[in-house]
């Protein structure tokens, strides 16, 4: 609905189960300008320069190859296209032991990247106008549930960037 009657939405997921669920939801709401494709965020099944906006909600941190994710996002975006993501990040680095403990708590948290490394990977892919905003309230709520950690801090971020 947000893209209007002339817009088109492509959803990508790596699992057939999530694609089937997405198709059921699409049928339930009666929209026909949405299509779903099976693929990985490191190798999107989308043509070069064919996308205006990429939205990602707590997925990039799950990838072990974040630079590849950002290169791929840059590849499929048109010039002037925007990437908007919500993701878990850290300020500082967790030790391998802390990451293992976090992984036991929630796999998505253990994949959180240091904000400086995350931004640098975006820059290296070619993105500009990169903004990272700490969504403090959710992070504070989450922090009380996480295992104790050293000097690193986990936070939930809203990230935006532009392909020029």
Question: What are the residue ranges of the model-derived segments?
Answer:
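Class I SAM-dependent methyltransferase SAM/SAH-binding core
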Residues: 1-44, 68
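Short, glycine-/aromatic-enriched active-site segment of Class I SAM-dependent methyltransferases
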Residues: 89-109
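Hydrophobic beta-strand segment of the Class I
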Residues: 54-55
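Core SAM-dependent methyltransferase catalytic element
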Residues: 125-128, 135-136, 141-164
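A short glycine-rich, Lys/Arg-flanked "PGG" loop and its adjoining helix->strand segment in the class I
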Residues: 67-82
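Short alpha-helix
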Residues: 110-132
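Short conserved loop adjoining the S-adenosyl-L-methionine
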Residues: 43-48, 64
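Helix-to-beta-strand junctions that scaffold the AdoMet/dcAdoMet cofactor pocket
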Residues: 4, 62-64, 77-79
